[in-house]
Every structure is written in C-alpha cells, then in structure tokens.
Amino acid sequence: MACKPVMDGVLWNLGASSFPTEEQNYTDSAEKWRKDFDDMKHIGIKKFMLFTGVPQGMTRKAAAAPDIIEFIISECDRCKMDFIIATGGHPNWFLDWKMPDEMKLVRSYVDEIHRRYADHPSFAGWYIDYEFSLRYNDRQYLRDLYRETVILCKEKTPGLPVITSPFFNPPTSTDIMQCGIHEPQEYYEYWSDMLAYSKPDILALQDTGGQHLSFFEKDTTEPYIAAYAKACAENNCRFWGNVETGEFHVGSAEEFTEKYGKDGHVSEHPEIWRPVPIDRLQRKLEVMSKYSEANMSWGYQPFYRPSMNAAAATAYRDYEKYLAVNFPEMLVD
C-alpha cells in the first residue's frame, strides 16, 4: 500500500451540506470545539481543511468566537495540525461563466484570508473550491479557472501547496442524477490535461463519486481511482484520497430510480444519509490506500466529531476500535 488505510485529515463544512448541520459550528461553545479537536487529535488527524462556507465563516459571529475561522486555526496551532483553507468563489460558479468576475471575487477572498490567518504556524495551503468530474462543454473555462486560481495562491504564499478534490461517477444501470457514464480512460485523459495545464500540487480524489451511493464497491471504484492516480503520477501532482464517511443508503441503481426517479438528487433527501458502516469504511480505505500517500475524509464528520449526534458518537467509537486493533500507533492519548 502507498499509505496506511487510515484517515489523517478531515475536510470541514462551515456552510450547508447534505449530512451535518452547519448550525453546530456557530452554536457550539469554545469548550465543545476544543473537545472536538481533542477527539480528532486522538484518532490521528493531522490535517484540517475548511471548504464550503469560508466566506460565511469570516463574517458570521459564532458562540465560540467572533471569528470562527480564527478560532479554528488557533486550535490547529494547539493540536499541531496543518490548516488548509478554500479559496472561495461564487456559489453558482458552475452556472455563471464570467471569468473576470469570478477571479475578482476569489482574489478578494484570498487576500482577506491571507491578511487574517497566514501568520499562524499551522497555515499550510489552499483548496480550490470548484469540484467537478468531467465537463466537456466548459472545458477551456475550467482549465483557465483552475490555472488562474493556482497562480493566485502561489503568488500569495510561495511554497505552500494548492489542492483540488474532483470526483468520478461510476457506471450504473441507469444514469442516476444525469451524471453521465464515462470509462476510467476518459478520466485519465481529461485530468492528465487539466493537471498539466493548471498545475495544482495535490489532487485528493473523492472515492464514491458525485452520487455518493452506498452500493458502490471496489470492483466499481478502483479502476477510476487508478486512472486518477496515474494522471497525477505523470503530471508531478501528489495523489491523496478523499475517503467519504457518509453515504446515501440505497441498495441498487434500480431501487434509487424506483424511489426517487432517475433525475432525483441525493441532496434532496438528507434523512437517507448515514455514516458508512465500519466494515465498508475499512474496505474503502484499503482500496484508496493502494494508490494514495495520505487520506482525507470529506466533511460529513460522523467518524471524527462524536459530539454531533448519537450516530456520530457510535461511528467515532467504531473507528477508534478499528485503529486500536489494526493501527494502535495512530491513537494519541
């Protein structure tokens, strides 16, 4: 394996998401937040990445602190975690294709983030806040959008990495959510070109696709993971995993179509989401870790924020037991 089948980093929402509630970020006390960080440190989390909701986090007061991001990065300092932050962007960037306006907005966010937080010792990089898999009609726009964002970040903080986290859509018997059906070779060719042109430092691949469905297993996902890893290896880009710990619980593509329609969307049914069962999470980590040098986990939070609810507390304990049995060196007292 390229790395241990464990999570050593988390991606955290400050804005709306399909699974966790954003409100807890703003209503929890400083004491509860510190306990969250201690819980993450205990299970070996070394990287903390903020993505959705960064502009909101810079302006909305929270119970823990007037500036919740300042509080979070200070906790990263305390816990010796690397802090990585999204560049921000227009909420409807995928609908409103205006490069000058978009880059003006991103530059304003990057400038403000740098002014407020870059002096912290944990400040360790940037996350490109544009997630997609394959978009052929908008391909040149996206190539330029990525390239200009990477250049902007590297001008602001030379030497710090810029990270992106695309996804893939595994084939299903019906075209769920109109994601399209594409072979691994298409992803390899598309992202080889994207990486060569835009030059991000790290690609952290989401491991269960834009559909986030619970029935995807190794035989479906691994060819896509291998294709992205190959594109990274050939384009001087480090390959990380983004192993998702929440999923939309459904048994098959046919069941999804019958219940929600082919054009239904998983974000419309938050009640169906669940923490990934621990045996399935282990399989997901093992597949990704054959290729990745490190594994993040996208921002559902149940396996690393036990304060969220009872299901999250159970998931956290399950993962803690997994580490105790298989990788006890990851646990920190």
Regions found by a protein language model. Give the residues of each.
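Aromatic-lined carbohydrate-recognition surfaces of secreted/lumenal glycan-active proteins
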Residues: 6-15, 83-104, 127-131, 146-185, ...
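Substrate-binding cleft of secreted/luminal carbohydrate-active enzymes
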Residues: 48-49, 200-214, 231-333
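Catalytic domains of carbohydrate-active enzymes, especially glycoside hydrolases
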Residues: 5-9, 25-56, 75, 193-204, ...
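Active-site groove signature of glycoside hydrolases
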Residues: 90, 109-140, 201-209, 295
